[in-house]
């Protein structure tokens, strides 16, 4: 038999009535064997990871290679975000919009109550107090995740600020927190043996925007189970941001220091697997410039009293796609990972107790144990690591972490980049004509689908601001919020907006631009545009660099490649304008008039 409400109230390390009532209610519903309040300590983490190793969920890695690090291997049916089972249950269907799945809230609550009834039987119910952003921010954003997964506790300890200190702050009168409940949906009957990766074939990731609640059932995988990440910091936070006058975005934050020692901050949005982490941890090939990072995935932005748009990273860790992250492509990420204290999921194991994935090293090991537990050699048909395998690493292990990461109020932005993955049409970099034109660029961002989301690979899909799977309300209202919000700021201080595409191909199918560290040449061109120093050609789509204005010193690139990278083809853009027209029609009446005006302007300029 599970617990009654009373023991929760007797032993809980909090007096917050709303929190106590909610924990008691969830315990009564889910019937766990015991309740544990997470304190976030080192001793607790050691005990939990020891238990996970004993259960077969985690494998302890060779401490000489990866100190205090572990690898986990999921059920093959639980490897990515499940967008088709992700719901925004707003009170009115219109408020969810066409980009989200919707169900009537009362109907969904009935369904969830049925699924969660007894779902934690035989398991420990962990209560994780956490904060997104800084504890000493003006308005800290608290959450409490209830979960029956110790793997989630260990991962949340890396990804957010958790435990006793947070709980102490939640004690303060009027402290608001987002309640987030997660269950693997794998109750254990007395005497029933557990499996290494419990989950359920039926999965539901549900958000109630008005009451700021998150319910997640059936999946133990990162984005579905670490509820502070996409569920809170983007889906629920985007609704809070709309209501409170700020922005919650799927963006990295960079700090750039020029040879003249002038500092600039830049945010950038990219859909999954378009090089976001590589740009966040950029190793510049351009002389005299220094690059530091403040974050690789999520950015919260608001206007300060002086009218500047400031950005903060609400996360405490990196949850990066492993394949393609390597010593030659992203040495900064690899150095952070090599320090240990990490949890890897669905990577391959080396024979000496380390981890490996495609793209990690130039040489492939002669033998591995693949993510499914099978013996693997370079002749094997399948990749050794799952394409969406992950590393979960503390952000403070990054050598190039900017000290401003610790500023509760964030940093003032000079520029915002939007980038997709397109073989044709979109040039290497385009500066928008103005702020609204920049929102137009962001609203039409497009990319070819990747392994990070379950579904078809290689289809071009529109991904406004790289937020398509993460907007917690109507997408047209979200774009309207971008248009309206700028009026709060000092128009002179608004960040300049640029559209980038590292993935343009030449006629023979090769990449037109080398990418990786050489993307610093594009980023510095953008900064020099802000300073009025770099030349550009005005095209129907915006301002594109002249060949001479890019610093190509030491770069091995042919004239043909550069021409292909910067080309604005009128025929391709005529087709693109039609495609955008089709995309915009999907918004119905909620698309801002300003963006329809931008599309008409583009068509006119294309003639």
From Swiss-Prot:
Give the domain of life: Bacteria
Compartment list = Cytoplasm
Q: Which residues form the active site?
A: 274
Give me the comment on cofactor binding.
Binds 1 Mn(2+) ion per subunit.
The positions annotated for binding Mn(2+) are: 230, 250, 297
Name the enzyme group at the top EC level: lyase
> Is Cytoplasm included in the keywords of this UniProt record?
yes
CDD domains in the record, alphabetically?
PEPCK_GTP
Say which species the protein is native to: Renibacterium salmoninarum (strain ATCC 33209 / DSM 20767 / JCM 11484 / NBRC 15589 / NCIMB 2235)
Function of the molecule: Catalyzes the conversion of oxaloacetate (OAA) to phosphoenolpyruvate (PEP), the rate-limiting step in the metabolic pathway that produces glucose from lactate and other precursors derived from the citric acid cycle.
Q: What is its EC number?
A: 4.1.1.32
Can you supply a Gene Ontology BP term from the record? gluconeogenesis
Cofactor requirement: Mn(2+)
Write down what this protein is called. Phosphoenolpyruvate carboxykinase [GTP]
Task: State the taxonomy lineage.
Answer: Bacteria, Bacillati, Actinomycetota, Actinomycetes, Micrococcales
Primary gene name = pckG
């Amino acid at each position: 038999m599970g617990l009654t409400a009373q023991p929760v109230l007797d032993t809980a390390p909090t007096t917050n009535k709303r929190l106590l009532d909610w924990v008691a209610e969830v315990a009564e519903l889910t019937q766990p064997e015991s309740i544990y309040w997470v304190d976030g300590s080192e001793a607790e983490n050691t005990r939990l990871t020891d238990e996970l190793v004993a259960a077969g969920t985690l494998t302890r890695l060779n401490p000489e290679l990866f100190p205090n690090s572990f690898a986990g291997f999921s059920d093959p049916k639980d490897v990515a975000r499940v967008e088709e089972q992700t719901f925004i249950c707003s009170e009115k269907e219109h408020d969810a919009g066409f980009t989200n799945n919707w169900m009537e809230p009362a109907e969904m609550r009935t369904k969830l109550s049925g699924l969660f009834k007894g779902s934690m039987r035989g398991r420990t119910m962990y209560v994780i107090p956490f904060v997104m952003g800084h504890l000493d921010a003006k308005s800290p954003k608290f959450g409490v995740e209830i979960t029956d997964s110790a793997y989630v506790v260990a991962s949340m300890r890396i990804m957010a600020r958790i435990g006793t200190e947070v709980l102490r702050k939640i004690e303060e009168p009027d402290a608001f927190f987002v309640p987030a409940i997660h269950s693997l949906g794998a109750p254990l009957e007395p005497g029933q043996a557990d499996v290494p990766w419990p989950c359920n074939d039926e999965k539901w990731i549900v958000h109630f925007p008005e009451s700021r609640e998150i319910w997640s059932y059936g999946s133990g995988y990162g984005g579905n189970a670490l509820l502070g990440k996409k569920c809170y910091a983007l889906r629920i936070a985007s609704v809070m941001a709309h209501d409170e006058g700020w922005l919650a975005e799927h963006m990295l934050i960079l700090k750039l220091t020029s040879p003249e020692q002038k500092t600039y901050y830049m945010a950038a949005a990219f859909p999954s697997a378009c090089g976001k982490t590589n740009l966040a941890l950029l190793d510049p090939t351009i002389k005299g410039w220094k690059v530091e990072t403040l974050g690789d995935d999520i950015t919260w932005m608001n206007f300060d009293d002086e009218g500047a748009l400031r950005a903060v990273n609400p996360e405490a860790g990196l949850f990066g796609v492993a394949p393609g992250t390597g010593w030659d492509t992203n040495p900064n990420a690899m150095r952070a990972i090599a320090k240990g204290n990490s949890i890897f999921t669905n990577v391959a194991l080396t024979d000496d107790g380390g981890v490996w994935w495609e793209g990690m090293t130039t040489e492939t090991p002669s033998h591995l144990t693949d993510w499914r537990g099978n013996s693997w050699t370079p002749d094997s048909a399948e990749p050794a690591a799952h394409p969406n395998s992950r590393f979960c690493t503390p952000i403070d292990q990054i050598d190039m972490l900017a000290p401003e990461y610790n500023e509760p109020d964030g940093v003032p932005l000079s520029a915002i980049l939007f980038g997709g993955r397109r073989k044709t049409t979109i040039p290497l970099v385009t500066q928008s004509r103005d702020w609204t034109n920049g929102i137009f660029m962001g609203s039409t961002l497009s990319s070819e689908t990747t392994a990070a989301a379950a579904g078809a690979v290689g289809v071009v899909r529109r991904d406004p601001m790289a937020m398509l799977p993460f907007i917690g309300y109507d997408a047209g209202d979200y774009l309207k919020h971008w248009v309206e919000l700028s009026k709060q700021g000092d128009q002179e201080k608004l960040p300049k907006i640029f559209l980038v595409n590292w993935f343009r191909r030449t006629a023979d199918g090769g990449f037109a631009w080398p990418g990786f560290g050489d993307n610093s040449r594009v980023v510095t061109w953008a900064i020099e545009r802000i300073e009025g120093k770099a030349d550009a050609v005005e095209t129907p789509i915006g301002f594109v660099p002249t060949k001479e204005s890019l610093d190509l010193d030491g770069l091995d690139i042919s004239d043909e490649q550069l021409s292909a990278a910067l080309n604005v083809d009128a025929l391709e853009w005529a087709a693109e304008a039609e495609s955008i027209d089709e995309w915009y029609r999907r918004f119905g009446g909620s698309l801002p008039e300003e963006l329809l005006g931008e599309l008409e302007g583009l068509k006119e300029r294309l003639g």
